[in-house]
A protein has these predicted regions:
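Edge/loop elements at the starts and ends of beta-strands within beta-rich repeat scaffolds
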Residues: 39-46, 209-213
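Gly/Pro-enriched, hydrophobic low-complexity segments
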Residues: 122-124, 130-137, 151-248
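Flexible, processing/modification-adjacent segments and terminal tails
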Residues: 28-43, 60, 86-88, 96-173, ...
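Bacterial N-terminal signal peptides
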Residues: 11-22
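A short, Trp-centered hydrophobic/proline-enriched beta-strand micro-motif
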Residues: 42-57, 77-78
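N-terminal secretory signal peptides that target proteins for export/translocation
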Residues: 1-7
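Generic short beta-strand segments
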Residues: 50-55, 82, 161-165
Length: 263
């Protein structure tokens, strides 16, 4: 894969976690306008491959393909392990309808297990991310407020605080995003529990400019118990047409990539 393609495709790493944003802002946005722009970048249908390095000592590296179709009203996201060989085929389907979440875990050769709303905070493939981090975007929450400004490594950022409204169940009481106002890239996201303790922190460790857009190339996720996961993207195809069957428990048993994805 050439460098140009690799740079462009890494933007999905941020899209998955609410980090990949459009290009330079020309005027200050209100909190709700900013959240709307963030949410818009997560919408659409995509096929992606990423690499996860899990752990801070002897790292475990897994390669994953992601199929997604997301709108304001609903979302379906599938994560499937391609490597290492002993874990190939392990898959997770996550579904959102409004503010309700569900899912399915598939372990080869034929083990299917449902994920209930109470299990959304469980780890994705042993990483520092939870199922909830993947399927529930804080930028879709009803309460959005700009609570201050702060420099991140010399870069001025607006701090956007997101809180779930009534009827929205989340294990987080609030989420703060440090957004580079010039490039509209969140350089940090912190997720808090009800006591105000940081449960997860997501740092953008490298940003590149490509085609007028500033894209997060590398992310580092710090989770509960000192867990650490480094995520990089390697391939992206937008505007993919998926059959409904690909977002079903039975569809998890297939590792097929969409035509034209370069797989």
């Amino acid at each position: 894969m050439n460098l140009d393609l690799r740079i462009r495709t890494t933007c999905f790493v941020g899209i998955c976690l609410g980090l990949a944003l459009p290009c330079v802002a020309f005027a200050a946005d209100t909190a709700s306008e900013l959240a709307t722009k963030l949410r818009a970048k997560q919408s659409g249908s995509m096929f992606v491959r990423i690499r996860m390095e899990i752990g801070s000592g002897e790292n475990q590296t897994i390669q994953i393909q992601i199929k997604s179709r997301v709108s304001d009203a609903a979302g379906d996201i599938v994560y499937q392990i391609l490597f290492p060989k002993e874990r190939k085929g392990e898959s997770v389907l996550l579904h959102r309808s409004g503010h309700k979440f569900s899912g399915t875990v598939f372990t080869p050769p034929n083990n299917l297990k449902s994920i209930g709303s109470a299990e959304m905070k469980q780890s994705l493939f042993g990483s520092a991310l939870s199922y909830e981090d993947i399927i529930d975007s804080p930028f879709a929450w009803s309460q959005q407020t700009i609570v201050g400004t702060e420099d991140m490594d010399g870069t001025p950022c607006q701090i956007l605080e997101s809180k779930p409204g009534k009827g929205h169940t989340s294990s987080y009481s609030s989420v703060k995003s440090w957004i580079d106002s010039r490039r509209l890239v969140p350089l940090r996201i912190e997720k808090y529990d009800s006591s105000g303790k940081v449960v997860r922190r997501i740092n953008t460790t490298r940003v590149l400019l490509e085609g007028g857009d500033s894209l997060p190339v590398d992310l580092k996720v710090y989770g509960p118990g000192g867990s650490v996961t480094h995520i990089t993207g390697s391939r992206l195809k937008r505007g993919v047409s998926y059959a409904d069957s690909e977002f079903t428990p039975e569809g998890l048993k297939q590792l097929n990539a969409p035509p034209g994805s370069g797989s």
